[in-house]
Each structure stands twice: as structure tokens, then as C-alpha cells.
Amino acid sequence: MQPALAPHPSAQDHADQVLHDQLLAAQHQHLTHPQQARPQPPAPQPPHMQPNTPARDQNNIDPAISGATMLTGPPQTPTQPDVTGQETPKTYGKRPLSTSKRAAQNRAAQRAFRQRKEAHIRELEGKVKAYESMGEAIKALQAENYQLREYIINLQSRLLDSQGEVPELPGNIDLSQPRSEIPVPPIPNSGTATTTAPPPTAPQQPQPSHAQAPTSNDDMNSLNRIAVAGLGMRKPPTEEANYLGNNFQAQARRVRPDEGQPEASELPKQEQTHGLPLIS
């Protein structure tokens, strides 16, 4: 039989080198990551995997190295999560998601803005239509107001004409008695004896006091014509012509008082031809 061979010295050197490298790696990891938790010690190797080294070889190992190795054990590199590999898909997945969400929010905001704008435009259009209708109503009221003003002015002029004061007749004059010198009004073409007074003008302002004399004379002439028409009396053509001339002059003075005509006080007194006595 051949004797058992002793272990080769290169195996011992290899084990020492491995332990030394593991110790240096553990120290470097501890310095670079002080806050990181200490990794769990590895499971003990089965006895058949351990090298068959005698006690004398183990005693030759540096005690500092052997103590650190026994305390820390063979370090294992902690499995750190692949930050780049995991964050890249998240970032790539979040960006399209956030962009699509932002786009949806922008579309919703634009839609709400368009709705508010359309509602505001409709409200303004309604106000414009209301203002236009109010303007038409105001114009109609103004036109009606002008018409009513003209109507009121016309009524006032007629009221002044109808309420003109007629002077009282003297006590010694009786219009019911026939007189030969009473003028006879002109007979119209239709053959009737009734005549109408000329249409009165529509004065906007009351006439002065000095212009009341021709008006009172005209009123007297109107009363005389009514009385004569009721009695059916006639006069010669000469007296009728004189009466017509005097009546035309009185009307001309009343219608055009401001066209260079003298006032009533400056006109020469003319003898009345109505047949009534003059009272001074």
C-alpha cells in the first residue's frame, strides 16, 4: 500500500487569498454603506466541502484575519434592486399617463370656457334685443307724445275761440225789432238764408288787450247776422256791399296784425254801418 498524500500547499494559499479578498470587500462595503443593514451570514458549508487542512495550518493564519472572518463570515453582496431597470419603465409609463391626463384636463377646461363664452354671448344678445325693443317703444311713445301735444294745442285754441267773451248789448237796443238800416248777410248760392262765420284762427298765445276791439265788433256783427237771418230781413245791395267791405277789412286786421299794420288805437275811427247807435 502507498501512504496518504499530504495536501498540496497551493490549496492553502488559495484559501488564504479568498479570505483576504472577502475581508477587504467587507471593509470596503462597510465604509461605503454605513447605514445599510448588515447582511445575513451565509449558511455553513457542508463538511465535505471544507478543505482538509490540519490544525497546524490553521494556526499559521493571521489572528486578525481569522477573527474578522469568524465574526463577519464570508460577505455576500446584497442584492440591490435594479433602480435603472425598474425606474425607467415607471418613468416611461408615467409620462404618457400624466400627459394624457393633462391633455384631458385641458380639453375639459377649454370646453367649459367655450360653454361659458357661448352663454355670455347669448345673454348679451338677449340684452341687445331687449334694448332695441325698448328703443322702438320709446320712439313710439315720443311720436304719440308729439301727437298728443298737437292735439292739446288744437283743443286749447278751440277752447279759447269758443269761450271768447261777448260784450253785453245796451239796454235801449232790441234785436228782435226790425230795422231798415240793419245789414243783411250775403245769400249763399244754395239759396238758404243761413250763413256761417269765418273759421277762427288758432292762436297759440292770448292777444293783447288793445286788439280786443275788432273782435268785439265782429262778435256784435255775428249776433246781428243771426238776428237778421232769423227775421228774414233784406237790405238794398248798396248797404250789403258796404257791410261786406267793412267785414273784409276787420278780418284782414285780425288775421295779420304783425305785417306792418297799425294798431287799433292808431286807426281812424270809421262810422259803423250795422245800424246800431254808437255809444261814446
UniProtKB/Swiss-Prot annotation:
Residues 79-89 have a biased composition (Polar residues). Residues 96-159 form the bZIP domain. Residues 39-49, 197-206 have a biased composition (Pro residues). Residues 1-102, 169-280 are annotated as: Disordered. SMART domains: BRLZ. Keywords: DNA-binding, Nucleus, Transcription, Transcription regulation. It comes from the Eukaryota. Residues 124-155 are annotated as: Leucine-zipper. It is found in: Nucleus. Residues 97-120 are annotated as: Basic motif. GO terms for cellular component: RNA polymerase II transcription regulator complex. Belongs to the bZIP family. Putative transcription factor. This is Putative transcription factor kapC. The lineage of its organism: Eukaryota, Fungi, Dikarya, Ascomycota, Pezizomycotina.
